[in-house]
């Protein structure tokens, strides 16, 4: 299983958001959960003047958390990533995350 990091594109494989994809905003390693952009939104009620970011208060919609076991890393073409390693591509100077996919059976 590929390690999930902030900024990765993931697909939800279980739960009420199953089949949807999004970008990881935060990884909560201690809790075993991730926050995915625009998925599992929760409503928070905030009093007026409690936050500099939202001085008017009101009802905020924030991304909730999803169990890390319920998401899977997908590549740029929306296909699942099977193996991943850190290394250099041919001719590249910087290290990057290289992804390998399972070969298609014929």
UniProtKB/Swiss-Prot annotation:
Highest taxon, organism lineage: Bacteria
Signal peptide limits: none
GO terms (BP aspect): translation
InterPro entries associated with the record: KOW, Rib_uL2_dom2, Ribosomal_uL24, Ribosomal_uL24_CS, Ribosomal_uL24_KOW, Translation_prot_SH3-like_sf
One family name in Pfam for this protein: ribosomal_L24
Region annotated Disordered, chain positions: 84-106
Keywords, ordered alphabetically: Ribonucleoprotein, Ribosomal protein, RNA-binding, rRNA-binding
Record GO terms (molecular function): rRNA binding; structural constituent of ribosome
A cellular component annotation (GO) from this entry: ribosome
Start-end of Basic and acidic residues biased regions: 84-97
Subunit structure: Part of the 50S ribosomal subunit.
Main function: One of two assembly initiator proteins, it binds directly to the 5'-end of the 23S rRNA, where it nucleates assembly of the 50S subunit.
Family from the record: Belongs to the universal ribosomal protein uL24 family.
PANTHER family assigned to the protein according to its UniProt record, in alphabetical order: MITOCHONDRIAL RIBOSOMAL PROTEIN L24
Protein name, UniProt field: Large ribosomal subunit protein uL24
Species of the source: Anaeromyxobacter dehalogenans (strain 2CP-C)
Lineage: Bacteria, Pseudomonadati, Myxococcota, Myxococcia, Myxococcales
Gene that encodes it: rplX
């Amino acid at each position: 299983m590929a390690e999930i990091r902030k900024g990765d594109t993931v697909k939800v494989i279980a739960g009420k958001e199953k089949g949807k994809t999004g970008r990881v905003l935060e990884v909560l390693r201690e809790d075993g959960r991730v926050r995915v952009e625009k998925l599992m939104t929760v409503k928070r009620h905030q009093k007026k003047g409690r936050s500099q970011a939202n001085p008017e208060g009101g009802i905020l919609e924030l991304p909730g958390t999803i169990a890390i076991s319920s998401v899977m890393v997908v590549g740029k073409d929306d296909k699942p990533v099977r193996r991943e390693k850190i290394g250099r591509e041919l001719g590249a100077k910087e290290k990057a995350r290289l992804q390998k996919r399972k070969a298609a059976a014929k």
